[in-house]
Structure formats: C-alpha cells, structure tokens
Amino acid sequence: MRWGCHLPRTSWGSGLGRTPQLPDEHISFLIQWSWPFKGVHPLRPPRAFIRYHGNSADSAPPPGRHGQLFRSISATEAIQRHRRNLTEWFSRLPREERQFGPTFALDTVHVDPVIRESTPDELLRPSTELATGHQQTQAGLPPLALSQLFDPDSCGRRVQTVVLYGTVGTGKSTLVRKMVLDWCYGRLPAFELLIPFSCEDLSSLGSTPASLCQLVTQRYTPLKEVLPLMTAAGSRLLFVLHGLERLNLDFRLAGTGLCSDPEEPGPPAAIIVNLLRKYMLPEASILVTTRPSTISRIPSKYVGRYGEICGFSDTNLQKLYFQLRLNQPDCGYGAGGASVSVTPAQRDNLIQMLSRNLEGHHQIAAACFLPSYCWLVCATLHFLHAPTPAGQTLTSIYTSFLRLNFSGETLDSTHTSNLSLMSYAARTMGKLAYEGVSSRKTYFSEEDVRGCLEAGIKTEEEFQLLQIFRRDALRFFLAPCVEPGHLGTFVFTVPAMQEYLAALYIVLGLRKTALQRVGKEVVEFVGRVGEDVSLVLGIVAKLLPLRILPLLFNLLKVVPRVFGRMVSKSREAVAQAMVLEMFREEDYYNDDVLDQMGASILGVEGPRRHPDEPSEDEVFELFPMFMGGLLSAHNRAVLAQLGCPIKNLDALENAQAIKKKLGKLGRQVLPPSELLDHLFFHYEFQNQRFSAEVLGSLRQLNLAGVRMTPLKCTVVASVLGSGRHPLDEVNLASCQLDPAGLHTLMPVLLRARKLGLQLNNLGPEACRDLRDLLLHDQCQITTLRLSNNPLTAAGVGLLMDGLAGNTSVTHLSLLHTDLGDEGLELLAAQLDRNKQLQELNVAYNGAGDTVALALAKAAREHPSLELLHLYFNELSSEGRQVLRDLGGSGEGGARVVASLTEGTAVSEYWSVILSEVQRNVHSWDPLRVQRHLKLLLRDLEDSRGATLNPWRKAQLLRVEGEVKTLLEQLGGSGH
C-alpha cells in the first residue's frame, strides 16, 4: 500500500516538513541534542532536531552591521516577546498530531523535504501532469538547503525574494512552521526579525484599507516598538508570505498603484504587491509559498529564486521520518482504560518491517514521496498498533488527513464560485474511484483518468479550473504505477484512498443515472411553476366542468413522489451493492480488513508473487467501511468544513437503506474474519442505536483464529459492549489474546453463556480479570474454557476466589494450563467453595498420583460435580488403576476419567480424550503426547487381554487403531 505524511494547519495550511539539502545519492545528517544558541532566547529545554550539513544553524550571518540594529533594551525585549509569542502560536498542534504521544512536538521531530531550484523557463513549459510528475529530481540545478535560499544566484546577484512552490501535500505549511520555530530558537541568525503572514488571513480582510504597520501590529503587538526601525533593517528583515494562492494580486499599475510608505493604508493585496515589487521596504527579504498554478501571479522580474518542494525523493528521508515519528512514546492507555502501551521492541519491529517494505515495494515508496502520505502511514500504523483514543476510527483518520491538507483550500481564489478544492476532487477523483470499485480495478489508463476529469466540461472557464486542479492536486490523489507489468498506468496514491473517495462520491449523492438527472430537472421545474398552475387549474375547474383538469392537477402532485421513489430505489441499490461487497463469499477466507491494511503497509514476509503470475481478484472490503464511517456525525461535520456537506436527511435515508439490507444478509453465519469486518463496519459508523437494531439477532460471536490486537478488542467491545441480549457463545480461541485485551472485552464477556478462551496468552495476571468477571452480578457464563493457557497455580487460586462467589458456571476446562501438583492440590482444598460446578477438566497438567487422588476424592464429595477429567497427567499405572476403581465404584459422586478404559471395557469418554489430542496435536509437546498415548495404548492392550467378550475386544481394537494413527501423525511408532 502507498501512503504519506502531513502536519496540522490551523491557519497555516497543510504539508510537512524540512530537509536541508543533500547530495543526490547520499544523505548526510546528524541527530543531536542542542540548546538554543547562547545568548539567544533560551525559550525551551534542549530538543532533538535534525541537522544536515549546510543548515542555517551553521551558516555565518552576512557581513555588515548584523546584530547592531535592535541593540536598545526596549527593542531587544520586544523582539524577545515576539519570539515567545510566535513559539507559542506555531507550536500548537491539532488533535490529529497529539495522538502521537505527549512528547511529540514539531520542533523535536522534523525532516525537511527536498527543495530543487528551478528556472523561469521551466515554469513556462506546459504542465506534464502525471506522466512525468514523479518524484525524480530533474537533472540540472542542485537541491537547495534552507540556509541557501537567500544565497547569491549563479551570476552573483543578491537574492531578496524566494518563491517556494509545491503541490498539495509536499510540505509547504510545515516547512514554514518549522522555519519560524527555527528563527525563534536562534537557528536562523541571518535574520534579526521575522514577520510571518498567512495570506488566508489577509484575504479575509477583503479590500479594507490597512497599512503595513497596522497589519504587523494587529497581529504582533510587541513589534510596535520596533516599527520605526523596520525601514533600516534591510535584508535582516524577513517577511514570510504563506499560501499566496489565497490572494488575488494585480501587478498592473492601473490595478495597484505604487506605494512606498509602510504607514500608508491600502488594501492588503496592494500592500503585498508593493512589497514584492520592492517599492516598499526594498531591502527586505521575502519568502513566498504557493501552489504551482499561481506562480505566474508574481512577475518573474520580481523573483530572485524559485524553489520546487519535491517531497521525500529519497527513501532514506522517508525512513528517517518514520523512525522519528513512530518512536514517540504513547500515553499507554486505550479507549477502555486498559494499559496497552507499545513497547520499544514492538516499535522497532514496526520500523524495521516498514523499512524493508520501502526497499522492496516501490509503489509505497512512490506514495511516501509526498510527506503528507508519510503522515498517513504513521497515523494508520498508530491506529492499528498503539492505544486507540476513544471514538477514533479509520474513516476519521482519512477525513482528518484531508482536512489537514485541504481545509479552507479553494480551487481558484479569483473565481466567483469560490469552489472548494476538496469538493472538486470528490466529484472528479471520486468518480474515477467509484468506477474502479464497480469494475474491480485499481490500475487506470490515461484515457480513464482524462475521461473522469473532462466529463461534463463545456466552457473555457470550466477548463481553466480543471487545469488548476491538474497542476495543484492531481498528483496528491494519483501516482504513476511503478509495478512490473503495469507501467504506463496510474493508481491511487494509496489503495485505501480509492475506496474512501468512492464511498465519498456515493454519500455525497454525486452518482446519478441519466434518468435521475432528468427527473431532478423535471421536479425542479414543476416545483417552480406548480403552485401557479395549480391555482389556475383550480379556478378554471370551477368555471368549466372539464374532467381532464383534475387529472392534470393530480399529475402535478405525483411527479415529486415518483422522483422521490426513484431516489429511494437508487439508495437501496447502492446499499445492496455495499452489503454484497461486505459479504462476498470469495473473501470469506481472507484476513480481516485490519490485518489486510497492516500487511499493505508493513509488507508480508516471504516470497513475492512473480510478475507473470495471474493477479488475484481485487478486494474492496474497505469501501463499505468507509461508507458507514462517512455517515457518522463527526465525519459529516469535518466534511462540511471541506465544502462537502452531507445533509442530515440524506444521511438518514442512506442509513435506513443500509440497515434494511444488513438486516436481511447480516443474519447469516459468517466466518470469523468476515464477522470482525461486519463489527468493524459498525465501529466506523459510530451509531449505537443503529448497531443495536442490526445486531439484535446475533447470538454467536465466533472470532476463533482472528488475531485480537488492542484495536480489534476495542472494536468488539464498543460495538457489542452496550447490547442487552445474551450471547449463546463467545468463541475467542487461538486469538493471541492477552490480559489487556481480556480487560477491554469485559463488557462483551458479561453477555456470554459459553465462553471459549482456549489457546491464548492468558497468564496468572489475566485471572484477576476472570475473577472479577465471575464475581460480577451480571455474569451469566455457564461454560468456561481456559485450556492451553499458562494460568499456573497462582492463577487458579484467583479463579477459585471467583468460582466461590459465582452461581452460573457449571463446566470449567483447565486442560493444559500448567497447574502442576500445586495447582491441583489447591483445587482439591478449595473445590467445596463452589456448589454449582458439574464438570471439571484438569487433564494434561503434570500432576502426580497423590494430588490427582486427592482431587478425585474431593470431586466425589462435591454436591454437584458429575465429571472430572484427569487423563494425560503424570500418573503411574497403579495410580490410573486406583482412579479407575474410584470412578467405577457405585457410591455415587463424580465420575473420574483418567484413561481410555474402564476396567476391561472402553471408556465412554474415549472419543472426548482422543478429540482433545487431535485438536491440540500441533500445539502440545509431541514427545510428551507420544509418551502419554503409549501408556494409554498399553492400557488398551492390557484390557483387551483381560477380557473374553468379543464385542469389547472389537471396541478395544478400534480405539487402539485410533491411538496408533495419532502416534503415526506425531512421528512415533504405534507398536
């Protein structure tokens, strides 16, 4: 899978980060601890930051009167307050970044993207769109470090204005944010004063007159005292103009007059134009960031250097970014309050797997060329493996990702429509994505892409908007395919983005048939004229007794209802397609969708499929998940901010259509992985009432074999934890469940009648939660299977405390739980504390004759116990014989099963014993099992030799054959 990185915006847009420049094939960098420079604003304790050779922190200030301008005490204090204010403002992170842990901060974890110097001639070339819009840095001028942006050009001329441009997602906003913080900490000594402006903020002022001094003091009050010195600051004053595409600049003298006075009021756009003209503050340095489509708004004669932000064009930069991000310590608590902190070893393993996948899977490296998608990779891995904040869903991560990149972004600020860039992307890229999902393909030809982009374009104005989208945002969504066998095609930058956009295209109601479009126009026309026509027809009908008029009158009322039914049928068809995609039988034996997503990022260990082999059928199991997630209230609110509102009525009708289809198909028994996908859909939807109605018929929760990560435990608990009806059986066998997961699942386990927890990682610490579960007043468990867990004697003591106060459990399996003599002795001593138990299985626990006999006697005296399993313990022949005799006595009490025989006959429980062996043959110690089977085989042979009954001999021979077959499977001799 292919993904990327991005940082919060507040008013500073989207993007990621910083990498001063590097040679083509080598990245020389040093991760080090550093205080701010001595004497320069010690605002914070030491921070780890990335420094490449040639960083501005190492460059000497320019010659001249540097350091002499703001020497007065008042000016120095004003600058220091300005630095503190900027640090406070630019260090604030949105919620999406705080998820990475309490110590995460932009000034501690940052990697610069590659910046390549470009020339005006390159900017005049026609856009090459996707075919060459790849991450390869073009030959020619070398990459630039931040410290080199204002170095003299190749002709020795001083550079005063630098324009940095890049498509959505390349890291413009984060680069600016980090540059400001660098100045605040003294790592940009070439500039004594830095004044950042957000062009989005300036555009909100419209044409309201304001002078440059007013614009500065309104935003940075401490600078009032240094404004008189601004004109003398020269190149040591740096203006940062971020997001120039938000301003409509007119450099014609007829449109914007000349003005050199910083105190002269004028429209903000005019102030910026005169700054860029070098007519106002001609010596000041200016750094501009913008999108590619708006570079031409500044005449090239006013620009000293152009720099293209090329993202992470080297996988070493991507690896460094992932290492810094993923090594941040988390808070250690999941949504359920359980301690589920990720260990350093687990984080290292994630980073190593991701690094190997970057090296061997070129498509994910192509996606992570955009720093924004590196952010998405980290956010997704954090969601899959770290503690999950309450209410966070996969859909919300993708929606937040788009908000970080597209919030407030318009396609063209000069266009009267003020069309949202995300809205345009949903219509065009969503159409391509949905057509791909419908036809089950992920590779698109250039004709496919053009067909979706140019559909419905009729005017020159629409064509111009399309060209802007192509230059600024198309590379964000689509990337050239670099996989063998598919060169020359395009894919969505990450596969999941295709499914997200397809779902968005549907829930926004953008998919319409020709009949629906015509019907909508007819309804709108009827709505406009219907009332007037109805009034006229009513008057005419009273004057002239024409029978046709009432018919026409009623037809006008019918048209909206017919169209409403058409829309309803369309929603039902979409819901049907979504549910069928969720329950495709072809996907029944796939991994669950969360494991699929993790594997797409981290890769799958083992040999890769040969390029010439036929490809597997494409799977789009995330598409229905995203459809449900986009209908949740939180995601609809965020989408509305992006200019993609989903009406409440539309969301309700879509949800009703989905519920209707889920109610029909959701009752079928699903394989464990598909059942988890079904529950994940409800988790994404975040609607408890909806889930309770759809899942009200669920009686069996079979997740056996599903790897229950902390996230999956959270999903199951949040969806089913609030239900009221009991679950006949909850099967969590072989789920790699640990104590933290067990704690998270407690609300679900309380509803279970039969609970299977065998073959997990539950040790003595898990028995504390099991004890609390058994003592809970709502516990209704009757059968509890804990076999093949390392409970030990310490754990069984806690279990007995729970059983002492429990009134529901009748069947308890402690098969192969490492109890030993100590554990069985404890059971024998405390068994009488419980009065309801009917069956107890303590087979294969390494117990000897003495404690086994003591437990058997305690079981015989128990008021309700009917059956005790003791086979496969370390029993001697004499011990087994004593237990057989005890179980066969006619004094009543529990039956004791210690062998395959009862006297000279086959035990009626022989099939139970051999079934347990068959079921666990691959997880138990083969040598130990062989030894026990040979002892049982000897018992069978002895019993066969001691009986003359031919029927019994035949039964004994049959069981002997079964035992010999098992021995052969284990590699032992059946003789």
From Swiss-Prot:
Residues 160-483 form the NACHT domain. SUPFAM superfamilies: P-loop containing nucleoside triphosphate hydrolases, RNI-like. InterPro entries: Leu-rich_rpt, LRR_dom_sf, NACHT_NTPase, NLR, NLRX1_C, P-loop_NTPase. Induction: In macrophages, transiently down-regulated in response to TLR3 ligands and to L.guyanensis containing dsRNA LRV1 virus infection; however, protein levels are not affected. Participates in antiviral signaling. Acts as a negative regulator of MAVS-mediated antiviral responses, through the inhibition of the virus-induced RLH (RIG-like helicase)-MAVS interaction. Instead, promotes autophagy by interacting with TUFM and subsequently recruiting the autophagy-related proteins ATG5 and ATG12. Also regulates MAVS-dependent NLRP3 inflammasome activation to attenuate apoptosis. Has no inhibitory function on NF-kappa-B signaling pathway, but enhances NF-kappa-B and JUN N-terminal kinase dependent signaling through the production of reactive oxygen species. Homohexamer. Interacts with MAVS. Interacts with TUFM. The LRRCT domain mediates homodimerization and LRRNT mediates trimerization of the dimers. This is NLR family member X1.
